UniProtKB/Swiss-Prot annotation:
GO BP annotations listed: ATP synthesis coupled electron transport; electron transport coupled proton transport
InterPro entries named in the record: NADH_DH_su5_C, NADHpl_OxRdtase_5_subgr, ND/Mrp_TM, NU5C-like, Proton_antipo_N
Gene3D superfamilies the UniProt entry points to: 1.20.5.2700
Gene symbol of the encoding locus: nad5
Membrane association type: Multi-pass membrane protein
Keyword NAD: yes
TM segment ranges: 4-23, 30-52, 81-103, 112-129, 133-155, 168-190, 200-222, 243-262, 272-294, 301-319, 329-351, 364-386, 409-431, 452-471, 505-527, 607-629, 639-656
Function field: Core subunit of the mitochondrial membrane respiratory chain NADH dehydrogenase (Complex I) that is believed to belong to the minimal assembly required for catalysis. Complex I functions in the transfer of electrons from NADH to the respiratory chain. The immediate electron acceptor for the enzyme is believed to be ubiquinone.
Catalytic reaction(s) noted: a ubiquinone + NADH + 5 H(+)(in) = a ubiquinol + NAD(+) + 4 H(+)(out)
Name of this protein: NADH-ubiquinone oxidoreductase chain 5
Record-annotated disulphide pairs: none
Enzyme Commission designation: 7.1.1.2
Lineage: Eukaryota, Fungi, Dikarya, Ascomycota, Pezizomycotina
Keyword Translocase: yes
Family: Belongs to the complex I subunit 5 family.
Length: 658
């Protein structure tokens, strides 16, 4: 069952990719969708067997590397963390496959698209189930390449080319540091197997653990789009909308958070790594929320909300609340996939326009889409008893419940980030569905709900966004739960804060995020409805324009990167090419050799004068050279006689030819 779970998406991908012309579009849909749906059902069985019944499974398939210094197995590990990650990955992936049947129905390259989707799912399964860092790295690189292929799916568009290369190169920075971290583990521990490294970690110097942990954090920063290496995430919106849902909800962006959670028995022994995670997540949360508030593209706003929620998960890791971070990851996958697929339904119905300032008044035309996006937005802003409420608020309470200065400051920073999340969620809903129509007539003339394939995934995800958090909170974060008794998540006894979070945090600080959520939602809609001129006048003032430009241009970080990093690297590369590749290498290599041989042949050619006395002089000089050689180096006289005889024969032949 477990190997079938891993292999099925790969078989679907190969069938659709290599035999797409034989099986046709419908055959590709049937094979890939049925493969992923069957894999999802097997993952649910694995969740019950491994997670609920606490029966972890390890499967050794074959030996990969068998060297004296390194032994690596094709080994797959199914524990509570693995099966918890498989649930959102495969449920969202299967629903995205179904959704794409309708969304991509007019695209001529359906087989290629579904092949990429299934391959993406397979690589994520490899990443999650691998039993050592090298196998995990195979999946890690695989999802990176698949994201490049999917973002660049419409490869005739320049924007798609640029975005995919940006995603690939930004992730290469993180991959480089992750590789260094894996080599450091190999050098320190002599192996890269999870069990061996985690069992030895308590006995190693904290500085070594810190160095390895920082490399892992930088790798996770790129993949999970934290501040500094975040620029690829909004640009990835150039891909088709189902791709955005798959990348930003369930697969690629969660890989970095998974890496840190899987490495919890390692990074728990380095307080430096934990404090870096704490502050990195806090800065990312408020940073991305501020940018998202000033974006006008519906998909980019949702992308920045993803970045903000990933910051929340990294805060949970920095607090050693790995189970809460995992719970938030699973919850977030459902309502974020719903937001993206809902946005895709809106874009699909209004002639592929993504600027939500040109929407407005779509609620009567798209009642189902409005309902599901309202549910997803309520879950995103953590309205009580929605799925997002049970994990997001608990992360904030854990930050305060740590009772350190850093934790308290992070609590207030993350609360501010949650406030801005509320504002842009209300903004998207209001400007898309509730305000007066702002778009051209054609947008509304042909606006319509999608077919069954578009609507079924929306309804299923809406149900998950309402009920999943309540139904599973005791499994993931209950005080007496035995779900993680297999030690897949390790919390050092000194870092255990769940009891303090539950019982010691004052009620005021538990209710503060909820108070801000409700009050800001109401205030933003009231301002927009009753005093729009006040907002418009402020925006057109010098101060308002400067503030809007600063945040709309994403703190000018990309401008700084281009000016001070990219330009310098390109200049250095140009100079290197000019001086080495096109300079000394070619001068000493092909061009230099050719020029030298031509000069040598011309020089030899000049010796052929056609005058007999000149040739006699050459013979005399040669004879003197060989005699002196014999004298100085003691050569055999027979050899000299042979040489002289040969010279006379050659000379005689030349004279006869003339």
């Amino acid at each position: 069952m477990y190997l079938t779970l891993i292999v099925l998406p790969l078989l679907g991908s190969i069938s659709s990719g290599f035999f797409g012309r034989k099986i046709g579009v419908s055959g590709s849909h049937i094979i890939t969708c049925s493969s992923v749906i069957l894999t999802t059902l097997l993952a649910l069985l694995a969740f019950i067997e491994v997670g609920i019944n606490n029966i972890p499974v390890t499967i050794d398939v074959a030996r990969w590397i068998d060297a004296e210094a390194l032994n690596v197995m094709w080994s797959f590990k199914f524990d509570s963390l693995t099966v918890s990650m498989l649930i959102p990955v495969l449920i969202v992936s299967s629903l995205v496959h179904i959704y794409s049947i309708s969304y991509m129905s007019h695209d001529p390259h359906n087989q290629r698209f579904f092949s990429y989707l299934s391959l993406f799912t397979f690589m994520m399964i490899i990443l999650v189930t691998g039993n050592n860092y090298l196998l995990m790295f195979v999946g890690w690189e695989g999802v990176g390449i698949c994201s490049y292929l999917l973002i660049n799916f419409w490869f005739t568009r320049i924007a798609a080319n640029q975005s995919s290369i940006s995603a690939l190169l930004t992730n290469r920075v993180g991959d480089c540091f992750l590789t260094i971290g894996i080599f450091a583990m190999l050098w320190s521990f002599g192996n890269i197997d999870y069990n061996l490294i985690f069992s030895l970690a308590p006995y190693y110097n904290e500085n070594i653990i810190t160095m390895i942990g920082i490399c892992l954090v930088i790798g996770a920063t790129a993949k999970s789009s934290q501040v500094g290496l975040h620029i690829w995430l909004p640009q990835a919106m150039e891909g088709p909308t189902p791709v955005s849902a798959l990348i930003h909800a369930a697969t690629m962006v969660t890989a970095g958070v998974y890496l840190l959670m899987r490495s919890s028995p390692l990074i728990e022994y380095s307080s430096t790594v934990l404090i870096i995670c704490l502050w990195l997540g806090a800065i990312t949360t408020v940073f991305s929320s501020l940018i998202g508030l000033f974006q006008q593209d519906i998909k980019k706003v949702i992308a920045y909300s993803t970045m903000s929620q990933l910051g929340m998960m990294v805060i949970g890791i920095g607090l050693s609340s790995y189970n809460i971070a995992l719970f938030h990851l699973v919850n977030h996958a459902f309502y974020k996939a719903l937001l993206f697929l809902g946005a895709g339904a809106v874009i699909h119905s209004v002639a592929d326009n993504q600027d939500f300032r040109k929407y407005g008044g779509l609620r009567p035309f798209l009642p189902l889409t409005y309902s599901v996006m309202l549910i997803a937005s309520l879950s995103l802003v953590a309205v009580p008893f929605m799925t997002g409420f049970y994990s997001k608020d608990l992360i904030l309470e854990s930050a305060y419940g740590q009772f350190y200065l850093s934790g308290t400051i992070v609590y207030f920073i993350a609360t501010i980030g949650a406030m801005f999340t509320t504002l842009y969620s209300a903004k998207v809903l209001y400007l898309t569905f509730l305000t007066n129509p702002n778009g051209p007539l054609n947008n509304y003339k042909y606006a319509h709900e999608g077919d069954l394939f578009l609507n079924i995934p929306l309804i299923i995800l809406a149900v998950f966004s309402i009920f999943f958090g309540f139904l599973t909170k005791d499994i993931f974060i209950g005080l007496g739960t035995g779900f993680f008794s297999d030690n897949s998540l390790f919390i050092h006894p000194n870092h255990e804060i769940l009891l303090d979070t539950e019982f010691a945090v004052p009620v005021l600080f538990k209710l503060l995020p909820f108070f801000f959520t409700i009050s800001l939602s109401i205030l933003s809609i009231l301002y927009s409805e009753f005093t729009p001129n006040l907002l418009i006048n402020f925006k057109f003032s010098t101060l308002g324009y400067n503030i809007f430009s600063f945040f709309n241009q994403r703190f000018y970080i990309e401008l700084l990167y281009n000016k001070y990093i990219v330009e310098n690297i390109l200049t250095l590369g140009g100079q290197t090419t000019k001086s080495l590749d096109k300079g000394s290498v070619e001068y000493l290599g092909p061009y230099g050799l050719e020029k030298g041989l031509l000069n040598l042949s011309n020089s030899i050619n000049n010796l052929s004068t056609g005058v007999v006395t000149t040739y006699a002089l050459y013979i005399l000089m040669g004879l003197m050279f060989y005699i002196s050689t014999l004298y100085f180096f003691n050569w055999d006289s027979n050899l000299l006689i042979l040489i002289i005889f040969s010279l006379f024969v050659i000379l005689n032949n030349k004279l006869l030819q003339k």
